[in-house]
Design a protein with these regions (language model features):
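Bacterial N-terminal signal peptides that target proteins for export
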Residues: 1-11
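Bacterial signal peptide processing site
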Residues: 23-25
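Acidic, low-complexity Ser/Thr/Gly/Pro-rich repeat segments typical of extracellular/periplasmic
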Residues: 48-143
């Protein structure tokens, strides 16, 4: 077989790599981290495992089963991780009693901007107290 006969196959393979790129470590999605919650005075605090220098860049809060257009998004929020916890005060978001919420947030390293972590937690507010509840299958990415 001559080169001209193989040219279409070569161009197909070559153009595929040009269009989609080579697979690498950045192409793999990381599963969401799960976390626990506790109440500290009026704040709702989420545990941050190995906080190092991670800070939230996005927080999304929604009631369970709410459509995405009803989710509340905070880009570059004013709350920070301190002592291994991300605490949300009532002045930032008011969680209503007798509801179940899904809280998602992205943590990003200050030193290494390419290091991001996605965290999700489901919480129930009952009689003004908070507790963790199991996530539904469609609320987190487990991979």
């Amino acid at each position: 077989m001559t080169f001209t006969a193989r040219l279409p196959a070569f161009l197909l393979v070559f153009s595929t790599f040009i269009l989609v790129g080579c697979p690498g470590s950045g192409d793999r999605l990381q599963p969401d981290e799960l976390t626990s919650v506790r109440q500290v005075k009026g704040d709702i605090c989420f545990s941050v495992n190995k906080p190092v220098d991670y800070q939230p860049t996005l927080i999304v809060i929604s009631t369970r089963l709410a459509p995405p257009q009803e989710w509340v998004l905070y880009e570059n929020p004013s709350v920070i991780v301190t002592q291994g916890e991300l605490c949300i005060p009532p002045s930032f978001y008011r969680f209503l009693d007798n509801r179940t919420y899904v809280v998602r947030y992205i943590l990003q390293s200050k030193k290494h901007s390419d290091l991001r972590r996605s965290v999700v937690s489901a919480i129930a507010i009952t009689n003004s107290s908070v507790r963790s509840v199991p996530l539904r299958e469609d609320e987190a990415a487990y991979y």
